[in-house]
A protein has these predicted regions:
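Nucleic-acid endonuclease domains
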Residues: 2-73, 77-81, 87-223
């Protein structure tokens, strides 16, 4: 099967982000973390907003421009390249990360579609909606910043577009009690995607292979 998103190797990631990305990211994050170390040492949990990850990524890439805050699907722009930044976390024994939003719809029909188990309408609204936004970007990339809850160290994974012609098939959709699991966007060994009824949005989780395999995981921050 041809997936929409495929994982990038470390050479590809370094080529996208630049040779000095890791060093600059470490420096930028230290500036954010330094005032918080007192509280972290006392056991307070570290909480960083979505935009802070975007700011640091933007500041760590030469000639990059931040364009997040819900203005478009991308958060960081480098010329015609658009980067969608997802900040997530995991525990030591996790098999997947926390979730991040990919696409949200506030249409009232969403709950009706779930009640009727109407997989095609849910797909058309969320998956096709997300694909439409991806197609609007000349060169789209999705990056995940995975923070370890125990150590606060971070690694980065990235995905590039391989195919935007993914079509609805009933067997790509599977209902659980509160969500519809969507297959086909990426290999399930790397990414899990679901549409949640209560949140009315398509969400992504990164799977353990993406941070365990050194071919795909780039260490970017050491606490």
């Amino acid at each position: 099967m041809t997936y929409c998103l495929i994982p990038m190797t470390l050479p590809e990631i370094n080529n996208l982000l630049g040779a000095n990305f890791v060093n600059t990211f470490q420096t930028e994050m230290d500036l954010i973390i330094a005032p918080l170390r007192k509280y972290i040492a006392k056991g307070y949990p570290l909480a960083l907003g979505k935009e802070q990850w975007e700011y640091v990524v933007s500041e760590s890439i030469p000639n990059a421009e931040w364009c997040g805050a819900g203005k478009s699907i991308i958060d960081v722009k480098i010329g015609s390249i658009g980067i969608d930044v997802k900040g997530v976390s995991k525990e030591e024994t996790s098999t997947s990360t926390t979730e991040a939003s990919m696409f949200q719809s506030f249409k009232e029909e969403t709950k009706l579609y779930f009640n009727k188990k109407d997989t095609e309408s849910i797909w058309n609204l969320f998956v096709d909606g997300w694909l439409s936004k991806v197609k609007s970007v000349d060169e789209y990339y999705l990056i995940g910043i995975v923070r370890e809850k125990e150590t606060l160290n971070c690694s980065l994974c990235a995905f590039k577009v391989a195919d935007t012609n993914l079509l609805y098939e009933d067997d790509l959709c599977k209902f659980t009690k509160k969500s519809m699991k969507v297959s086909g966007l990426a290999d399930s060994a790397f990414i899990e995607t679901r549409v949640y009824s209560s949140k009315t949005r398509l969400e992504i989780k990164f799977k353990s292979k993406v941070w365990q395999d050194p071919n795909y995981a780039l260490p970017i921050y050491k606490f």
